[in-house]
Amino acid sequence: MPELPEVETSRLGITPHLQGQTIKAIVVRTDKLRWPIPQELQKLVGQRVQSIRRRAKYLMIDTPEGSAIIHLGMSGSLRVLDEEVPSAKHDHVDLVLENGKVLRYNDPRKFGAWLYSEVGVAHQVLSKLGPEPLTNEFNSEYFAEKAKNKKTVVKQFIMNNAVVVGVGNIYASESLFMAQIHPKTPVGSLKASQITVLVAEIKKVLETAIKQGGTTLKDFNQVDGKPGYFAQELKVYGRAGKECPVCSSKIEEEKIGQRNSFWCGKCQFLAED
């Protein structure tokens, strides 16, 4: 599933091609992705793209008449192609530009979304979201306040979008490894020093992943079709049974909150109650 670095990589990739361009047409080849595709998207035809923003794992293409909101879901991807390139299987939406280019959305599993938002109106999917992890708003003081007296395990806590957005399964596992915190540690039991390190590692891991173009495991590729290279940097995620890069112990795996989780039992020691 594309996570924050993959979505940010997509934003950076499409921005030079869309910024300042006029939308000539929006071609929709399916009625429904995760949700029905609204007819209101057609209001954007003839409008000039003012900006491309990201909030959590949503992309927003802004025009004077409103915004297209895009979520890549489990298997969605965006490509910028010449308009004459024929559509292929699973190419569900085209944003056709007057410069002869098309932003094409492909989604084999159809768990993504294309939505519409009026100018000045916050769409309901963007409500109740926590701060962006790479902003100053997400800091150790904020984390400690949210974690106070909580028994939730730390991995589920940092993956909660109401706490902080965009820390998906891959990057949660990697950040906890770098911070030497076991993923099943009750978040309310973390020391201030551990929180400080974890917040710093979350930021560092996400920043590195964005620089590497995200992580390509199965479905994600960059806008130009190239893979994301952060997969080569993974220390624990997807490496069950392999040696820890720090201590050579075997990487362990277990489902936590229905998500596969990976850690080193030696580097990430779980204290007994």
From Swiss-Prot:
Protein's UniProt keywords contain Cytoplasm: no
Keyword Repeat: no
GO molecular function, a single term: 8-oxo-7,8-dihydroguanine DNA N-glycosylase activity
Known catalytic reactions: Hydrolysis of DNA containing ring-opened 7-methylguanine residues, releasing 2,6-diamino-4-hydroxy-5-(N-methyl)formamidopyrimidine; 2'-deoxyribonucleotide-(2'-deoxyribose 5'-phosphate)-2'-deoxyribonucleotide-DNA = a 3'-end 2'-deoxyribonucleotide-(2,3-dehydro-2,3-deoxyribose 5'-phosphate)-DNA + a 5'-end 5'-phospho-2'-deoxyribonucleoside-DNA + H(+)
UniProt: DNA binding residues: H90, R109, K150
Needed co-factor(s): Zn(2+)
Gene Ontology biological process terms, A to Z: base-excision repair
Cofactor notes: Binds 1 zinc ion per subunit.
Enzyme active site: P2 (schiff-base intermediate with dna), E3 (proton donor), K57 (proton donor), R259 (proton donor)
Complex and partners: Monomer.
Family: Belongs to the FPG family.
Annotated protein name in UniProt: Formamidopyrimidine-DNA glycosylase
